[in-house]
């Protein structure tokens, strides 16, 4: 196997309107809603940076400027904090994102699905490199290390694309992308297929896809040719199905806890989890 290239680029599809959280998301992007003291998007970005990504590609929509503002410098705010000797707050504001990390913003012109959103990043992804894709709605508290870093270790060891997986109750498989593993007793799982939100009786397993992927850059070329599928949208799972025809893709059950911050219940659960963690550490 030739030398595995380091994982440097991460794509964040953040163009969704967040209608489940109206009226709050009428003026605030759902990715900027806070879990304790940080917006949801910040957790995913930190996870990507921890895994070594230094080029972050945000696929945005209208009314998402707050995301760019958050990761940009704010000289006026920094000057005020410095003048008032608020050193701790100044340190936090200056270090939201490391100086070596480059943020790029691409507008998705129309909402044609997750696959299309990912494809919007195609001009920045070379076919010979792998790229991370993180869905911020899936907020993951990794045990000892972030989910993407766990995946990156599998990628670096094998050179194969990696998808994060979680087992769910069979009654819930219709809510997720579901994979067909070659052998459920060999980890990480080698995948034979993937399907989007199948009925229970059609599901190949109860191993479901979590919003973390490390995929061969060729996925972009495949998504370009992908026809609209479920819901009239271009599905990322359809592109992955095509990629499976030409290469090995691994499924990795991650160590940690996932919160579905795309739902009100999951968002509340995440706030309770991280809030209690802060209190246990003596935070305020």
Which residues fall in each region the model found?
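A generic "binding-loop/recognition-motif" signal
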Residues: 17, 28, 63, 255-257, ...
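Terminal amphipathic alpha-helical/low-complexity segments used for targeting or macromolecular assembly
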Residues: 1-4, 51-55, 73, 154-158, ...
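Short, conserved catalytic or adaptor-binding loops enriched in Gly and charged residues
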Residues: 91-102, 183-188, 242-244
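Conserved core of the sugar-phosphate nucleotidyltransferase
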Residues: 139-222, 226, 230
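Solvent-exposed alpha-helices and their adjacent loops that cap or buttress functional pockets
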Residues: 2-5, 24-25, 50, 96-99, ...
